[in-house]
Amino acid sequence: MSALMALEDFVDSTVTLFIQCMDELAISPPVPPSQLKDPINMAEWFQWYAFDVVGELSFSRRLGFLDSKSDVGNMKKVLDSFIQYASTVAMMPELHKFLLGNPLVAYFLSSPALVISDVTKQEIDRREADPDAVHVDIMDKIIQSQKRIGPQEFPHSEIFQHAVVNLSGGSDTTGIAMDSLIYHLLKNQPAYEKLQAEIDQAAVKGNL
């Protein structure tokens, strides 16, 4: 927890950008509300935000979801597909050898984690090209752990694996937690009103 608290400034910058995006949707939406065909998908926005937060925590940089207001590299779509596949195969593991576990199928289909893997590899390559650059993030902590433990017990491949798991797992669970929070607030009027009052009081005191 203390390690995450040290990275709080990274999260704050992404929170600020997320609020700006919400203000744009509320104050100057791309089309008038009366012309919106579908409600705004907040679950999608929350996961875009989560991807950028995890990018900041992991690599000291956003991944561009909120900046572009889009699913960068279809990472969210790919992750959703992978989760659906993994959920099914976890219940019926015998299917895996006929699907992605089949070398012929895997050859013709790109790996569900390929996009996330590419982002991670690019970051590792960037750091190896400039080893003297100072970073204060999770990737740096992983690299420092390898230096402390040694490459025999902590091989280079594990840096990649830890970073991929952090990026994919962290964004998904964070987005789901935010979805759940908003859902239950909307279902619980007293809790919603209490939170709104606390936010209003903090705004008056200049604590936001």
Functional labels for PLM-detected ranges:
Residues 84-100, 193-204:
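Short, compositionally biased low-complexity segments
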Residues 4-13, 25-53, 64-74, 97-119, ...:
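Cytochrome P450
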